[in-house]
């Protein structure tokens, strides 16, 4: 039986995710910012991989935003504010296997506009 297109896309995304995830790690002073997007919501979290703890997160569902380029900037502003409160200015960006365009690129640009370096 043939694999559906949606399952194939997700399988390939997970394959990219695992390949990249083996190469990048975050620390307490330079955490890894990982994103997840669904059709309805966008999530981002800053992770300290040495301890396995989430330092800060931003949830698009709680902010009441949709997944589009303009609304994702609000999620980035929220996360940047939380990171600055923790005195974190540099991060490692983990796009989680998603292609760097559209809402992912918009999120990354908004983080840079809010003073987060990567």
UniProtKB/Swiss-Prot annotation:
GO terms for cellular component: cytosolic large ribosomal subunit. Gene3D superfamilies: 3.30.420.100. The keyword rRNA-binding applies. One of its GO terms (biological process) is translation. GO terms for molecular function: 5S rRNA binding; structural constituent of ribosome. Keywords: Ribonucleoprotein, Ribosomal protein, RNA-binding, rRNA-binding. InterPro entries: Ribosomal_uL18_bac-type, Ribosomal_uL18_bac/euk. Pfam families: Ribosomal_L18p (PF00861). Disulfide bonds: none annotated. The keyword Ribosomal protein applies. It comes from the Bacteria. HAMAP family: Ribosomal_uL18_B. Part of the 50S ribosomal subunit; part of the 5S rRNA/L5/L18/L25 subcomplex. Contacts the 5S and 23S rRNAs. Belongs to the universal ribosomal protein uL18 family. This is one of the proteins that bind and probably mediate the attachment of the 5S RNA into the large ribosomal subunit, where it forms part of the central protuberance. This is Large ribosomal subunit protein uL18.
């Amino acid at each position: 039986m043939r694999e559906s297109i949606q399952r194939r896309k997700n399988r390939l995304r997970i394959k990219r995710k695992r390949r990249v995830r083996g190469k990048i790690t975050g620390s307490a002073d330079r955490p890894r910012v990982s994103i997840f997007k669904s059709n309805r919501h966008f999530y981002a979290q800053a992770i300290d991989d040495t301890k396995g703890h989430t330092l800060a997160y931003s949830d698009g569902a709680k902010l009441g935003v949709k997944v589009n380029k303009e609304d994702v900037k609000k999620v980035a502003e929220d996360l940047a504010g939380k990171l600055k409160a923790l005195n974190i200015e540099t991060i490692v960006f983990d796009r989680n296997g998603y292609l760097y365009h559209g809402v992912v690129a918009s999120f990354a640009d908004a983080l840079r506009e809010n003073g987060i370096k990567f």
